[in-house]
């Protein structure tokens, strides 16, 4: 059977050339983070956001700005077109619709007056109907109700 043995290189057994390691050179990072001496209470959200600017590369910032400006320009032009179209439609509606509505109302009035005149004409024909040998409307009504003529009440 084969046996494996670990052979260490002499190079790794000697200490490396360089400054001596001293544990006092290193400090606890937790204590540095918790120190509030660097905290500015006057720092605003925009200051913090502006400080993050260096974390994003200039090409990425340019790409985001291009997308932002393209989107805002599209929204502005769309809203501008929609406003102008709404103005044109409403003014056209007022210039055409109001006179049309007035003319339509007048036409309805004329039609109602003509119908009323025809009804009066028919009503007068019915009341005065009858020729020679025919009884008038009053006589027909009196005969229908079976009444005699009017008598004075004493």
Curated annotation (Swiss-Prot):
UniProt region (Disordered), positions on chain: 1-31
Entry keyword set: Membrane, Mitochondrion, Mitochondrion outer membrane, Protein transport, Receptor, Translocation, Transmembrane, Transmembrane helix, Transport
Positions on the Cytoplasmic side per record topology: 1-84
UniProt keyword annotation of Transmembrane helix present: yes
GO cellular component term, pick one: mitochondrial outer membrane translocase complex
Topological domains annotated Mitochondrial intermembrane: 106-154
Record's compositionally biased regions (Acidic residues): 19-31
UniProt topology in membrane: Single-pass type II membrane protein
Subunit-level organization: Forms part of the preprotein translocase complex of the outer mitochondrial membrane (TOM complex) which consists of at least 8 different proteins (tom5, tom6, tom7, tom20, tom22, tom37, tom40 and tom70). Interacts with tom20 and tom70.
Role description: Central component of the receptor complex responsible for the recognition and translocation of cytosolically synthesized mitochondrial preproteins. Together with tom20 functions as the transit peptide receptor at the surface of the mitochondrion outer membrane and facilitates the movement of preproteins into the translocation pore. Docks tom20 and tom70 for interaction with the general TOM40 import pore (GIP) complex. May regulate the TOM machinery organization, stability and channel gating.
Listed NCBIfam families: 3a0801s05tom22 (TIGR00986)
UniProt remark on domains: Its cytoplasmic domain associates with the cytoplasmic domains of tom20 and tom70. Its intermembrane space domain provides a trans binding site for presequences and the single membrane anchor is required for a stable interaction between the GIP complex proteins.
This protein's name: Mitochondrial import receptor subunit tom22
Upper taxonomic lineage: Eukaryota, Fungi, Dikarya, Ascomycota, Pezizomycotina
């Amino acid at each position: 059977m084969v046996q494996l043995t670990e052979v260490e290189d002499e190079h790794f057994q000697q200490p490396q050339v360089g400054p001596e390691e001293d544990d006092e050179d290193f400090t606890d990072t937790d204590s540095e983070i918790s120190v509030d001496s660097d905290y500015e209470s006057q720092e605003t959200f925009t200051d913090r956001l502006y400080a993050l600017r260096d974390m994003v590369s200039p090409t990425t910032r340019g790409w985001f700005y291009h997308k932002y400006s393209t989107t805002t320009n599209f929204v502005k032009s769309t809203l501008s077109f929609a406003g102008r179209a709404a103005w044109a439609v409403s003014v056209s509606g007022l210039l055409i619709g109001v006179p049309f509505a007035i003319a339509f109302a007048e036409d309805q009035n004329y039609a109602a007056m003509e119908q009323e005149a025809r009804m009066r004409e028919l009503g007068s024909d019915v009341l005065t109907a009858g020729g020679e040998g025919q009884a008038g409307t009053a006589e027909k009504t009196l005969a229908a109700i079976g009444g005699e003529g009017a008598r004075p009440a004493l």
